[in-house]
Amino acid sequence: MTAENTPLQGNLFVESEENLLDANSLQNTNSVKDSNLNDEELSKNAELRPRKRKKSVLLQNSVGEQTEDFSNDERPAWSHHSLVEINELTPVLRHYVELKQKHPERILLYRLGDFFECFFEDAIGLSELLELTLTGKEGGKKIGRVPMAGIPHHAAERYCSTLIQKGLSVAICDQLESIQNKEGKLLKRGITRILTPGTVLEEGMLQAKKNNWLAAILIESNSQTNQLKWGLASADISTGEFTVKEGNGIDTLEQDLLNIEASEIICEQLDVDISKKWQSNRIKITQQSKTSFSLQEAKAILKKHYNLKTINGLGLNETELALRAAGGLLYYLKETNPIHNIGVKNKCSKVVLDFPKNNLRGDSLIIDAQTRRNLELTKTQKDGHFQGSLLCAIDRTLTAMGGRCLRRWIENPLINSELILQRQRLITLLVEKRPLRKALRNLLRTMGDIERLSGRASAGQAGARELVAIADCLEKLPKLAANLQNLSINPPKWFSKLENINPELTKLAEEIKDKLIDNPPLSITEGNLINDSVDKILDGLRNQLDDQNEWLSNQEKKERNISGNNNLKLQHHRTFGYFLAVSKSKANTVPDHWIRRQTLANEERFVTPALKERESKIFQLKVKAANREYDLFCALRELVGGYAPIIRETAKAIAGLDVLLGLAELASTNNYCAPNIIDKKSLSNSRSINIKGCRHPVVEQMLVEEKFQANDIELGDGVDLIILTGPNASGKSCYLRQIGLIQILSQIGSWIPADKASISIADRVFTRVGAVDDLAAGQSTFMVEMAETAFILNQATQDSIVLLDEIGRGTSTFDGLSIAWSVSEFLAENIKSRTIFATHYHELNELAKKMGNVANFQVLVHETGEDIHFLHQVIPGGSNRSYGIEAARLAGVPKSVINRARGVLKRLEEKNKG
């Protein structure tokens, strides 16, 4: 069977009415016209013979597939579609090239029968990326064979997921009509889906506990300040979140882009001058020549998307660049959703987004990308793994929604003390009320990701199982609300969504459960989705199918009697239809009216004229029933999609509750305490950080054989700068990081790993920990270090936390000491930020004698002969030794090298004394 003659299969990515089998066009030969198939007769039939619901059964079909082996083919010569003369190609390849010319930057998957095929450069690239066999296909008499590689249609999502993870975009070209009555004509095909890293909705292509951001940026030069001004819009179309912001300076934009970790970043074609100013090697940007970022078109598309007469209520008129970036993002979403352009009757295919929220600077604790990396908030600094990060250590959420919410909290800690305390009070209540915490967590344990599921429904991509999952979750809401009644505290505003459940959601759950069977199949185009007694026309069709099945059963008995073969079976094959199966030994004794259909190794298959005639009618009934079920399902999906905004509001509240429950679980099982949050508006010592017995939240969980050494800190109340000295590998960096992490945990409302704490709110956290060459940017280790230091000195305020681990190491000793000294003085005298500076420049201990707001601390070491033992204990006072040679010995440096180092050190010390 050739690819063009293979029966049409439902597309994985879009289920359209055109992809359904049409009872009026299929099986032209031997078709049976029956007046009983009109809707009025079917409805009457259903009233006379009402159907009773049966227990749901998940139907599974396994269809064998055959693939042609081209492993011996030579590699075709044509390596790019632009090398061929399009008019010399076969019709299929000509259409492929026409589509490829419209989507040159995307991998084009072209549906041919049971496979999605690629040709030319896409085939070569796909074969290398996915380790597929590179084959060939005849391109025409003058062309010869062209490169071809393909993937089975049923595995398309898995392969596309791999491509998306590699940052590639995919255009899906599917068959839009059935082949039964085409009589050799070329099938109608068109782009039904465009998959890009920032626009995917498929569960298998998304990280469950991480937002998938699509960002759009607009950059313009400010002629007055000679500085670049920018607008940024970012949206997660899977959850509906949509934020915009404006700013100045390319460095600030780059920090924001690095912070959100967008899967895809688009922008208008950059001017040459802007491109020269911004040559970042850390951010990949796709310039979109077709994307519209003009003010007029941005306003138009915003009004159309949200069905508004004016956009004044969105509050974006004062931020023109952000407004235009938002318009560009929506325009890109429209371009990558081609459903309406090809005539597919998918009634519900709109991506539902929240109204754009203006994300103003100053609403949250600012954490730059370098600090996020140094503190290992969401991934480790060394290898980028989730394991070993702060998020991994504290995540006790039970839902994907809660996991994403916790990540957002960590990335954007609060600076409003009342909001912080609202969260903290709820966590305290949940710590104290263990039975309530346990009951709520048990309810959330089986809660699906209704935030994303409702988005898939609104986009017309949810299947029946996903609608049932939504209903299952919505059914739990009343019980969740009952457990939250009569709380003795004042919860955040979003909490009301859980205390007072919208009754419409309960009704929606009931309607889904009433219409869909309990365990529906994956496919939504082959029937067996809708319950009995939902639709009279469907019931009438099912009644007639029952009659046909009864006829088949009687026919089997009849043919057994005629043939005298009690082992005869009447069976059905998806390709060959109904047939009578007999063993080889009895194949020669069958009745004369039997017609041989197929010969197998152990069996012969036959049909009869009556069976062939009846088969056509049964097929017609099945197709009409399947189409009816699909229409009913689409109507239900559209209904659910309409509730997406309400469902998502509830989902966000569930996510917040999940985070609070998880943090309460963390606090109760890890001996955390609730810090006293100091509001700088009400107390004079608003900059104080006083923590007793603080611990590193990640490291202490990794220790198995030893207990973590807790330490104290007092900062901001008379002391603005701590000079921390001590040996290498003694725990100075760990101490610095744990202070930063505890500050962040405090400002998300969490309890912290400490015995007791009083913490004031910070506006920013800065770190300068370690440095590496940035060869791509032409910067040495020392230049990277100085750039990071300059950034801190230019941005820090007296409300900031600054954590420095060495400055001036990449130059001569005296140069480095001079820089470290002057930086310390500037921080203590000019900025007065709360700073901890870990250093091996013991000369900096002299600063405490000259400046009243500087204090010296050291990490203790116990010496026994030549051995040293790190106690990891921080105490007042400065150290005058670094124990670098001892640390080198512990690291395994050869003994001869160690001995030589001691000799050199002794001579240098004597020379210094002299």
Swiss-Prot record:
Entries under CDD domains matching the protein: ABC_MutS1
UniProt cross-references to PROSITE patterns, sorted A to Z: DNA_MISMATCH_REPAIR_2
Domain of life: Bacteria
Positions contributing to ATP binding: 726-733
Stretches of the chain forming a coiled coil according to its record: none
Annotated stretches, region: Disordered: 28-74
Key words of the record: ATP-binding, DNA damage, DNA repair, DNA-binding, Nucleotide-binding
GO biological process per UniProt: mismatch repair
GO cellular component, one term: cytosol
MF terms (GO), sorted A to Z: ATP binding; ATP-dependent DNA damage sensor activity; damaged DNA binding; mismatched DNA binding
Protein family (similarity comment): Belongs to the DNA mismatch repair MutS family.
Function: This protein is involved in the repair of mismatches in DNA. It is possible that it carries out the mismatch recognition step. This protein has a weak ATPase activity.
PANTHER family in the cross-refs: DNA MISMATCH REPAIR PROTEIN MSH1, MITOCHONDRIAL, DNA MISMATCH REPAIR PROTEIN MUTS FAMILY MEMBER
Listed name of the protein: DNA mismatch repair protein MutS
Lineage: Bacteria, Bacillati, Cyanobacteriota, Cyanophyceae, Synechococcales
Gene: mutS
